[in-house]
């Protein structure tokens, strides 16, 4: 919030005392009093957002829950890729995937758009630490962090085989370390990936 010197539970409308979560409670957002936040601001955008969030009932299910059970999951991170080049004649597999799968169209590169930051966001579902440099990226740190909730580890825990591939050398951006730590069997051009 603008003008707030520090963020505390009470500044977000929540109790400052510790909260015990039930097995059905998985989101800290449940402890935020959005109605109180809405009444405490004159900013119409914040007020409308808070009023909307006050009406949302947290749930573990949505329209996609279970829809793709027992299907394979393939994610493609293609830097500088233009969807105009997906055609039935030139790229039949990509064409089929884009017409029968789920595509996230509102995916944008991060500020200081370097490869490692976009790849980090896709793999982790988090924003990268923008204070880091290209050679000291968030991905480098991800090689040693505990990452049970990133996609590869989460799927592996559910019994999936998880693979990641890159058509360049494996130690570039430390992918040979980070991708293994994220739960993938990783292959690159210099480590097992046969590029023809």
List each model region and its residues.
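Catalytic-adjacent loop/helix segments of enzymes that bind and process anionic phosphate/sulfate esters
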Residues: 27-55, 61, 129-196
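Beta1/beta-strand and adjacent pyrophosphate-binding region of the FAD-binding site
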Residues: 72-77
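N-terminal secretory/membrane-targeting segments
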Residues: 1-71, 87-91, 98-99, 104-106, ...
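His/Cys-centered metal/cofactor-coordination and adjacent catalytic loops
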Residues: 68, 82-157
